[in-house]
Amino acid sequence: PYDCKNVIFTGGEPMLNDLWPIARVLKRRGYHLSVESNGTVEVPDGLLDWICISPKDQMYPNVAIRQRTGDELKCVYVGQPLSLYDDLKDGFDHLFLQPCYDEAMSVEKNGRSFAITEDVVKNNPEWRLSLQTHKWMGIL
């Protein structure tokens, strides 16, 4: 048997699925349950141990973020002003900026994106740097 007791619901938008029957079973069996969502659907209280919201505001600027609290707010940085998140960030314990990685761009341009994001984080210490590791490794 596999001893892992952590389950992360992610991929596409997990909150569009009826996760609660399987989540209840897993919770009764002692699993730690997490979700990574774009925040457009509110997460019901009480069943999940960790909520990560990763808005897709740079791709869909007119879509409302309904989940306004959680453990982690994770934003891909493409040069947007951080004030964009002022009304959202106070509801989260951890704030992360990720440099935008684009497989169509050169290594140099992606490196510049990383350096710019790193500077923004250095100048805004409430935010921490995070990487889309799977993209940097070519596991898309």
Over which residues does each language-model region extend?
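Glycine/small-residue-rich loop that forms an oxyanion/phosphate-binding "nest" at active or ligand-binding sites
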Residues: P1-F9
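Conserved AdoMet/S-adenosylmethionine-binding subsite of the radical SAM
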Residues: K5-N6, M15-L140
